[in-house]
Amino acid sequence: MNWRFVELLYFLFVWGRISVQPSHQEPAATDQHVSKEFDWLISDRGPFHHSRSYLSFVERHRQGFTTRYKIYREFARWKVRNTAIERRDLVRHPVPLMPEFQRSIRLLGRRPTTQQFIDTVIKKYGTHLLISATLGGEEALTMYMDKSRLDRKSGNATQSVEALHQLASSYFVDRDGTMRRLHEIQISTGAIKVTETRTGPLGCNSYDNLDSVSSVLLQSTESKLHLQGLQIIFPQYLQEKFVQSALSYIMCNGEGEYVCQNSQCRCQCAEEFPQCNCPITDIQIMEYTLASMAKSWAEAYKDLENSDEFKSFMKRLPSNHFLTIGSIHQHWGNDWDLQNRYKLLQSAMEAQRQKIQRTARKLFGLSVRCRHNPNHQLPRERTIQQWLARVQSLLYCNENGFWGTFLESQRSCVCHGSTTLCQRPIPCIIGGNNSCAMCSLANISLCGSCNKGYKLYRGRCEPQNVDSERSEQFISFETDLDFQDLELKYLLQKMDSRLYVHTTFISNEIRLDTFFDPRWRKRLSLTLKSNKNRMDFIHMVIGMSMRICQMRNSSLDPMFFVYINPFSGSHSEGWNMPFGEFGYPRWEKIRLQNSQCYNWTLLLGNRWKTFFETVHIYLRSRTRLPTLLRNETGQGPVDLSDPSKRQFYIKISDVQVFGYSLRFNADLLRSAVQQVNQSYTQGGQFYSSSSVMLLLLDIRDRINRLAPPVAPGKPQLDLFSCMLKHRLKLTNSEIIRVNHALDLYNTEILKQSDQMTAKLC
């Protein structure tokens, strides 16, 4: 063979690819496309990122194959040297360049641009030339292994890997048999990927593919390639520009110029490539990785909830009484198995948090010169207080396949998914004073027995001196219409006449069963006028109903604001119904069949029933319209013939309050209040009217218990004072004296704490 020809053939070889493959990577590596030892390769720039070896490595690693095993042998090895470049005197003995290459250099001129260098020289001939290398052929078998899958299939990943190594070692002895068995393992387990590589002349008598340089160059630790920059064969005035152009091509992918300033290097992007500094692909991969980490963060909490330690802890919690956050915390701290499991979770969360922070820092570092602003929020760690609240929610808000969040301040659940079926029966509270001594076996929500000094009355504990039967002589709190919530809902759907409360409709702005324009605020009231007509009754509201009809293709959706006056009085002495807040119900809208009318129903039930004398309903529309389309007056007959306006009109054909009346003995109650007032003015002679004090305390407690819900931490409304003012006609000073006397008796004689209330009337 003509060795001179071989030297001339390869002395201008340009090595345009750099292939790096790890022989082994720890199986504990993450799912990112590169591990920590390859962080310097994260930027998507230059030919390396698109080389075949790197792409194969990335693809296999994404599929979970974290270990590579390669067995190979080489044939027909020749050492070659570029003797032309080894000459030191290139002026007297110039390098014999190819005519096409010389023509390309002449086309550059004396001041070529970066793009000219890239298009004319670098893309055709590369950036380096070969100094010395080894020629020959290679036959290799490469296996990519996923040790986690091998472990699941065989039970011992180490033994499986050793067995695969022994099988692969017989490749050169029995190639066909080895490949057949490896392919069977690959198909049955999916834990390995097998690749064969055969390049170069595989025998001393075969030189058919010597013209393909890449097929006969050997790349191994023994057969190293020696390269040198192509600038050494350029004229001196082109050498610096070539280096800049080569760096721009490799680091900026030919989309800008590589510039270094103040120890920082970046790509100065061309106009047609404004995002050349931004590795979009890597950023997207990192964002996907962070999303996966956040998902695994949430799954770690679910794993703890599904663990045997947590389930056994939930089973050991007592279910015969209500558990506060404090009592759950005591049980939590006493469960050593759960504590050990919780510590493992905390350590895993800390490692995961650091991993997320490192990835996020890399993400933001890569996005410094991007127009793309990454949006990432570090997942919040669940505190011990949140875990205790979670346990409480699992205890009391996990029923009928629904779940929700428990609010201890209100002893109720906020169900998720717009349903109210998640709440289980809330057990009674066991404690001292008027708390239960034991919950009822028939109904765990009620008391079964009371502490010393208290007696059981209708499922609750009251002081023994209180005669609840006697308070019925003043106000008949217990009636035949105290149905369960399911019964009430059924009766409301049937419009049962027993629940009708006959009220008077009052409105200066709308008329029933008449179309009107709701785009301005409309007001209507339903009142009982009990002070004039029904002085011997007070009234309870348990629901409301309205029938609203709309024009066809109407875009309006009415919105209601409802104020309740419990015992008459002005509008300022009413309270607003907090629909959908603090567990309060919402309006239910049902369309009537073959009609443009809807039934709007509000079911308060036994939980939210309350006193009422007057109901004020303010009606608004959710649709905002131009001023020209508005009815400025909002009164008078409407023009239904105008097609531009009639689609906004609605009418209320029926409005009804559901509830019942309680018998109220105003004279008897007034005499009891006067006794308390006199005892207070005489210097606190409580003992002379002890039974009256206990009686009024019981009445006040039962009335204020029907107050509307308030935000956590805020006092309830004082409905008892409203009753004294409007039904008994007491003055403000008399009301203050009565309440003060009752508070003193409750704290000094009964040694009980007073519940703070807010003034309403």
Swiss-Prot record:
Q: Which residues are glycosylated?
A: N156, N433, N443, N553, N599, N631, N677
Gene Ontology biological process terms, A to Z:
cellular response to retinoic acid; central nervous system neuron differentiation; negative regulation of mitotic cell cycle; positive regulation of neuron differentiation
Q: Which residues form the MACPF domain?
A: 68-251
Instruction: Give the subcellular location.
Output: Cytoplasm
Q: Which GO terms describe its cellular component?
A: cytoplasm; dendrite; neuronal cell body
Q: Name one Pfam family in it.
A: MACPF
Q: Does the keyword Glycoprotein apply?
A: yes
Highest taxon, organism lineage? Eukaryota
**Which SMART domains does the UniProt entry name for this protein?**
MACPF
Keyword Nucleotide-binding in record: no
> What keywords sit in the KW lines?
Cell cycle, Cytoplasm, Glycoprotein, Growth arrest, Neurogenesis, Signal
Q: What is its main location?
A: cytoplasm
Per the UniProt entry, the signal peptide is 1-16
* Role played: Plays a role in neurogenesis and brain development. May suppress cell cycle progression in postmitotic neurons by inhibiting G1/S transition.
Similarity comment = Belongs to the BRINP family.
For this protein, the record's PANTHER family field holds: BMP_RETINOIC ACID-INDUCIBLE NEURAL-SPECIFIC PROTEIN 1, MACPF DOMAIN-CONTAINING PROTEIN
Query: What is the name listed in the Swiss-Prot or TrEMBL entry for this protein?
Result: BMP/retinoic acid-inducible neural-specific protein 1
Gene (name only):
BRINP1
